[in-house]
Amino acid sequence: MSGRGKQGGKARAKAKTRSSRAGLQFPVGRVHRLLRKGNYAERVGAGAPVYLAAVLEYLTAEILELAGNAARDNKKTRIIPRHLQLAIRNDEELNKLLGKVTIAQGGVLPNIQAVLLPKKTESHHKAK
């Protein structure tokens, strides 16, 4: 009889995510879904979510690296909002990109105007 089912057929290939194909950690499929549901355009190309996920991943990695350095400088092992604030505000390009962004519990950059600092007086007077 010929009704033996799928014995000799090809096995289905193991599913591979679009994120792994692109070599990314950020979810390409989720970004694609959000682009479609967000009414940004009538149609969304196949490369757009990959590109956007890559950009978001790069920016996140950049901020986290600088924040990790700030945490290490403060002898801490956990990144807190203060470290994110210091990382962003001390980097010229990130500060320009996120200039209007307020980070909760971030504090401010330490800055004292030069005119407010005590004047240096000449301590070594020549003996007459």
UniProtKB/Swiss-Prot annotation:
InterPro entries reported in the protein's UniProt record: Histone-fold, Histone_H2A, Histone_H2A/H2B/H3, Histone_H2A_C, Histone_H2A_CS
Phosphothreonine PTM sites in chain numbering: T121
Keyword list, A-Z: Acetylation, Chromosome, Citrullination, DNA-binding, Hydroxylation, Isopeptide bond, Methylation, Nucleosome core, Nucleus, Phosphoprotein, Ubl conjugation
Query: Which residues carry the post-translational modification N6-(2-hydroxyisobutyryl)lysine, per the record?
Result: K6, K10, K37, K75, K76, K96, K119
Looking up Pfam families in the UniProt record yields: Histone, Histone_H2A_C
Residues the record lists as Symmetric dimethylarginine modifications: R4
PTM N6-crotonyllysine: list the residues.
Answer: K37, K119, K120, K126
Q: Which residues carry this modification: Citrulline?
A: R4
Identify the Gene3D superfamilies for this entry: Histone, subunit A
Kindly list the positions at which N6-lactoyllysine occurs in this protein: K10
Covalent cross-link site, Glycyl lysine isopeptide (Lys-Gly) (interchain with G-Cter in ubiquitin): K14, K16, K120
Q: Which stretches of sequence are listed as region Disordered?
A: 1-22
Which Gene Ontology cellular-component terms appear in the entry? extracellular exosome; nucleosome; nucleus
User: Listed GO molecular functions?
Assistant: DNA binding; protein heterodimerization activity; structural constituent of chromatin
Which locations, inside or outside the cell, does it occupy? Nucleus; Chromosome
**Which residues, renumbered to this chain, carry the PTM N6-glutaryllysine?**
K96, K100, K119, K120, K126
List residues modified as N5-methylglutamine.
Answer: Q105
Q: Which GO terms describe its biological process?
A: heterochromatin formation
Q: How does it assemble?
A: The nucleosome is a histone octamer containing two molecules each of H2A, H2B, H3 and H4 assembled in one H3-H4 heterotetramer and two H2A-H2B heterodimers. The octamer wraps approximately 147 bp of DNA.
Q: Which PANTHER family match?
A: HISTONE H2A
Protein task: Core component of nucleosome. Nucleosomes wrap and compact DNA into chromatin, limiting DNA accessibility to the cellular machineries which require DNA as a template. Histones thereby play a central role in transcription regulation, DNA repair, DNA replication and chromosomal stability. DNA accessibility is regulated via a complex set of post-translational modifications of histones, also called histone code, and nucleosome remodeling.
Instruction: Please identify the protein, giving its name as recorded.
Output: Histone H2A type 1-H
Could you tell me which species this protein originates from?
A: Homo sapiens
